[in-house]
Amino acid sequence: MIKKLLFSQPRPSTEHNPYTRLETQFGVQCDFYQFIHIEGLEAREFRQQRINPMDFTAVILNSKLGAEHYFRMCEEMRLNVPDSMHYYCNSESVGLYLQKFINYRKRKVFFPESGNKFEDLLPAMHRRPNEKYLMVLSDIHTDDQINMFAENGIEVTPAIMYRTVTTPWPADKPFDYDLIALFTPAGVTSLKENFPDWKQGNTLIAAFGNGTIRALEEAG
């Protein structure tokens, strides 16, 4: 019988959430623990990629986290981002988030009218054939988006500015769950690194997303 569940994500900030209802309705215990966390690369590490952010006229951002680390890196490298820089974002929320860092003007920030597909930005990109694009990424990423741009005649330079790191499991905390829910491939990696000798036994594992499923299959 499933009585104790672990979700590899932060505890919800509000009391009314699906997990509370799960506990109330079925009498189970829901625990939360972030198996991974994000660390920004230091400027000296980033320089090893031999990329100068000021050589580009546009930045491609696929998350608020990417925006934070782009401006953080520029600050650490003592670079002044020019007011003429263009920003291509995969969603409106990321685009509007830039107000935290720049004097926001619609003519220099682009995002899809709906959804979060970079493909919807291709017309705007093709109108600026001389643009030079830098794409901010994590160390864990796929090349799908970069390949999509290349297939449409747009050259993009990937720049790794932050990385996903395993969060150590507390030594005094038991790991005795009936079900473990993993949400990312990095979570699978963290589980293996934290418990290299762990045997699944009767423990159920829930995986969210095709990438996480593949990571579990590869992990055996």
Predicted segment positions?
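Conserved beta-alpha
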Residues: 1-220
